[in-house]
Amino acid sequence: MDSAAAERPSSYAVNFPPLLPAPAPAVAGAMGVANHKSVLCMKWREGRCHNGVACRYAHGEEDQRIVPEMRVGGGGTSMHARSSPPRDGASSGSTASIAMAACRIEEQRHGRGGESFILPRSRRKRQALGSGSARSTAPTPPRAHTTPPCSRSVAAPRASTSPLRPSPVPPPATLHSAADVQRSVARALEDFEQRESSSSVFPLAIDIVAEDAMTATSEPSATSDDDAITTTTSSSTTDADELDAAVAAPPK
């Protein structure tokens, strides 16, 4: 009984089997089941892993491999454990635990984006190629024409046009009828005749005024001449009287 009890696994080992055995340290150039790398190296993702090829974790998707106990399911959308009969001393609970461990590894491998499982790598590549081709066939909008910035050392050419605003267009000429033209011509002739008549009357008035002025200046000169003649006559009479008186007087 003691030997049978010792060979029978405990309930803890049945309900909580180990998820995955720890991989053995990889050796350069050695390939085997123990060297399969199924988890990305967190230190490598942060850029501070110094183990290089000897690291037990994968450095990139090319270095990452799927565990042999995992296979692609029938639908190709999830990773499931191989449906093999349980080993000696293990029950069906261990198979379920292995499946859960495989799902956790797949989530750690590709990151948790909200979905339960991530598509396999081959199918993701096909979808990426399809989306890339569809994106390349989509028409691209035309780019806006932009002028290159002008260098400060190069002077910009002056504008050929004047900065002043153009003069406004003159208003259209008004149309006149024949009657309007005749009336304007008659009015111009009347104005011309009035100017001619006023210019002919003005010299005549000037001549009349000049004659009146000459007459007024000539009359005072005649009066003065008569006075001068009278004065001369009186003076000559006085001299004759004095001479007669001197002759008539007796000598002393």
From Swiss-Prot:
It holds the Pfam family zf-CCCH. SUPFAM superfamilies: CCCH zinc finger. Residues 133-149, 229-238 have a biased composition (Low complexity). GO terms for molecular function: DNA binding; zinc ion binding. Residues 71-95, 109-180, 215-252 are annotated as: Disordered. Keywords: DNA-binding, Metal-binding, Zinc, Zinc-finger. A zinc finger (C3H1-type) spans 35-62. Signal peptide: none annotated. This is Putative zinc finger CCCH domain-containing protein 58. InterPro entries: Znf_CCCH (IPR000571), Znf_CCCH_sf (IPR036855).
